[in-house]
């Protein structure tokens, strides 16, 4: 199965998509039943989903951003991290809360692990360095990852955090949102499923008015259906 960081190459409009997975954003099916790119951008495979992310809206690293990234390579003193950008990020062992010696990095973070980190510097060619040395920054254990368009992140967060707090409350989940479009969700599977559905709805309808109320109604309806189903099982 492909993972984030396994496939990331530049594609043009009309280029055939020749990887396996569930086609999602930026991909269309031609008359020959093959899949093609809609945009000039990067082909990305995250778990079982295939997306083409246009360069015009792809995440560009900025100093101070908090992002979720996946470790893709472990060196003697640094980790290379995929942050859902055309540019990889680096994390040095001195910028973590752990005391370790060079060459011992895999004990703390190995390839495939996810982290919630802060971008502490970005150079002129967009290479960025991360830190885990602030409260709340950490290795992410368990949970489920959702990838959305980075430009939709403010809509998922909502004014004053209102949207994401409402989703967390109605789904009994914990949610961490990276400004690069990766979102970590943990909790009971029913709640996680509901939260993912809500986030996908927000991404899809981000340009519309009255979205918070519709998402709240959507989640309450889902919750009611699940509660009713559980009650029916208990009565049988």
UniProtKB/Swiss-Prot annotation:
GO terms for biological process: CUT catabolic process; exonucleolytic trimming to generate mature 3'-end of 5.8S rRNA from tricistronic rRNA transcript (SSU-rRNA, 5.8S rRNA, LSU-rRNA); poly(A)-dependent snoRNA 3'-end processing; RNA catabolic process; U4 snRNA 3'-end processing. Residues 141-199 form the KH domain. Component of the archaeal exosome complex. Forms a trimer of Rrp4 and/or Csl4 subunits. The trimer associates with a hexameric ring-like arrangement composed of 3 Rrp41-Rrp42 heterodimers. Non-catalytic component of the exosome, which is a complex involved in RNA degradation. Increases the RNA binding and the efficiency of RNA degradation. Confers strong poly(A) specificity to the exosome. Residues 64-133 form the S1 motif domain. This is Exosome complex component Rrp4. Belongs to the RRP4 family. NCBIfam families: PRK04163.1-1. The keyword RNA-binding applies. The keyword rRNA processing does not apply. It is found in: Cytoplasm. Its main location: cytoplasm. GO terms for molecular function: poly(A) binding. GO terms for cellular component: cytoplasm; exosome (RNase complex). Pfam families: KH_1, RRP4_S1. InterPro entries: Exosome_RNA_bind1/RRP40/RRP4, KH_dom, KH_dom_type_1, KH_dom_type_1_sf, NA-bd_OB-fold, Rrp4, RRP4_S1, S1_domain. It comes from Thermoplasma acidophilum (strain ATCC 25905 / DSM 1728 / JCM 9062 / NBRC 15155 / AMRC-C165). Keywords: Cytoplasm, Exosome, RNA-binding. PROSITE patterns: KH_TYPE_1 (PS50084), S1 (PS50126).
